[in-house]
Structure formats: C-alpha cells, structure tokens
Amino acid sequence: MEWIQSLPKIELHAHLNGSIRDSTLLELARVLGEKGVIVFADVEHVIQKNDRSLVEVFKLFDLIHKLTTDHKTVTRITREVVEDFALENVVYLELRTTPKRSDSIGMSKRSYMEAVIQGLRSVSEVDIDFVTASDSQKLHNAGDGIGRKKIYVRLLLSIDRRETTESAMETVKLALEMRDVGVVGIDLSGNPLVGEWSTFLPALQYAKDNDLHITLHCGEVPNPKEIQAMLDFKPHRIGHACFFKDEDWTKLKSFRIPVEICLTSNIVTKSISSIDIHHFADLYNAKHPLILCTDDFGVFSTSLSNEYALAVRSLGLSKSETFALARAAIDATFAEDEVKQQLRFIFDSASPEHV
C-alpha cells in the first residue's frame, strides 16, 4: 500500500520516548553497557526484535527511562523522531513528553523541555514549524526549500500519574510559560493503575481555565468511576478508550470528544484481544471524530502508515475514505486556526492523487 505512505497524515498521540529509532537505542544502550550501568547482552535482542511481547515492551520502556536522562540525548531523539515522522509524510505532529527532573545531573523540568526545543531547532532533514502562528518571530528553519518536506510540530506536556498535585501544577505552569515555542496542551498519562483522578484534577482544571488544550489517557484499564469523571471533565480529546461500557460510549458520543486510536498498541498490550473487535470500527461507522495514531512507534515497531494500512484492511476502506479519515484529523488538532488552514490546503492539494 505505497499510496498510504504518500498520503498526508496527522499524528496526535505520539510519546517522544516511545518513538526512538532502534538503531539509536542500540547505540545508546551499548554506551550504557560499557559504563556498567546495564548489561548490554540482556537488552540487545529485545531492541533488535520487531515483534515484541508485552514483557519485552515493558523491558524496553525500563531501558528507555535509563537512556533519556541527559540533555544531549533528549535533544538527539527529539530531532530524529520529528525527522522520522516527516519522512513518512506526517505533515502535522503533536509530540508529547513528560518533563523530567534529575537533580544528580542538574536536569530540571524546564531544562528537559529546553533540550526538547533544541532538538526541534536542530532538525535539518526537513523544514519544521514549531512556533505558534501568532508569534511574529518565526523560529522555524523553513528555508523555502523546493521539494523538501515540511512538518508542523506542537508539543504536549505530560503529567505522569505518579506525580503529586503540586508537581502536576508545576508542569501546567511550565506549559503556560512555553506557549511561544509551540506548547499547546497537557496530557495525562503513565501507569493507569497508579494515582487518583482527584490528584490531577486541580492542575488540569487550571490548564483548561488558562486555555491549554487537554487530552487524557482514558479507559486503559477497567475503572468505571474514573472514566465517567474524565468524560464529565470534557477534555478536548481522549486516548485509547479500551475499557468503556455502554454508558461511557453514550456519554463520549453525546459530548463528541475525539478519540485517539492506537491499533497496534492496543493489540500488543492486550487491551484489545483482536483488531476484529476493536472499537475503532464502531466509532468510525457512527461517524464519531477519531484519529489514527502510533502511541509509541519505536517500542511497538509500527508507523503511522502501518496504522492506516491496518485500518484499511480491517474495514475495507477505499482510497477516498482513507483520505477523508486522514483529513478529518485536522479538526481534532490543538493547532491555531492559521495552521489548520494550511493543513487543509496541504490535504486539498493532494486530494486528486488519493481520491
């Protein structure tokens, strides 16, 4: 399905640290092995595998946590992730990451995010726009290169479910301070079995009151009370929605909250047993707003083109239906109106090729 590769695409649920190239992971892990921080032989085969088990996925996440603790590495992986998305014709990317603090190496939440921004600045393989359109001083490196790919990148700061209310509030305030470098929203993610909704609600409400967009990992595990509370909060989007009951679907659909669909991730993590029973089909047939996403393309050995191919095979979508699905994602982005207008132009310019 080469036409899917060339289709303009929008990615709205991508975790920075889960989207690292295998080759980069291998290189960084080898260095850690030489330093005696890890046993390289224990992780080498996991990195090189394409079809990873759930146990191996978690092992990889543990390794990534150890690898992404210095500013230089954060900058490098940010640059590579953006370039990888752009090369498969992703024209707009919302990249999410949890600002990290590591006192031992002098890393604060702010310095971590500054390393991410430096990664955006250092992108050279493609043209990139990562500053909100209202900012008069464009910091992107778009050099009017004819034939060069261009990608719009916006950032979401993630609140980890292990955090306290105070720490969550700190992340929201940092997001507000970094709006001029493309931060457009807040994500709530992390181990869904950890933390209480009431812990994060004050920070999320503060973010909403200050016009930051909100997306929530919702329904990753069975937790009816939390799912209802999250939906009542009326976030701008939710991710996954794997363990919804009928009343949850009813509320979601009545509120028209867009859903970030991560097919491969849901199957690998066994949140959904088979793509044949995935809720993607029901939402699509109900004409509910949804967006196909990768979640962690490195860890789950996928790509956005692959996610579209899965959807096409699963539902038997035509080229024109697939194009319409990809274009509809524009309305769910957290981008400013000027960028949405540019994205519509990009899709409409490509439509004769794909319809």
Swiss-Prot record:
What is seen without this gene?
Answer: Slight reduction of root growth. 10-fold increase of the ratio N(6)-methyl-AMP/AMP in leaf cells.
Which residues does the annotation list for site: Important for catalytic activity? Answer: H240
Functional note: Catalyzes the hydrolysis of the free cytosolic methylated adenosine nucleotide N(6)-methyl-AMP (N6-mAMP) to produce inositol monophosphate (IMP) and methylamine. Is required for the catabolism of cytosolic N6-mAMP, which is derived from the degradation of mRNA containing N6-methylated adenine (m6A). Does not possess deaminase activity toward adenosine, AMP, N6-methyladenosine, or N6-mATP in vitro.
**EC numbers, comma separated:** 3.5.4.-
Q: Name the InterPro entries on file.
A: A_deaminase_dom, Ado/ade_deaminase, Metal_Hydrolase
Tell me the protein family, please: Belongs to the metallo-dependent hydrolases superfamily. Adenosine and AMP deaminases family.
Query: Where along the chain is N(6)-methyl-AMP bound?
Result: H15, N17, H65, T97, T98, P99, K100, D160, G190, E220, D295, D296
Give the UniProt subcellular location, in the record's own words.
Cytoplasm, Cytosol
Q: Say which species the protein is native to.
A: Arabidopsis thaliana (Mouse-ear cress)
Supply the Pfam families for this chain: A_deaminase
Quaternary arrangement and interactors, per the entry? Answer: Monomer.
Protein name, as recorded? N6-mAMP deaminase
Give binding positions for Zn(2+).
H13, H15, H217, D295
Active site (record annotation): E220
The family database entries (Gene3D superfamilies) matched by this protein are listed as:
Metal-dependent hydrolases
Q: Which reaction does it catalyse?
A: N(6)-methyl-AMP + H2O + H(+) = IMP + methylamine
The reply on keyword Kinase is no
**A single GO cellular-component term on record:** cytosol
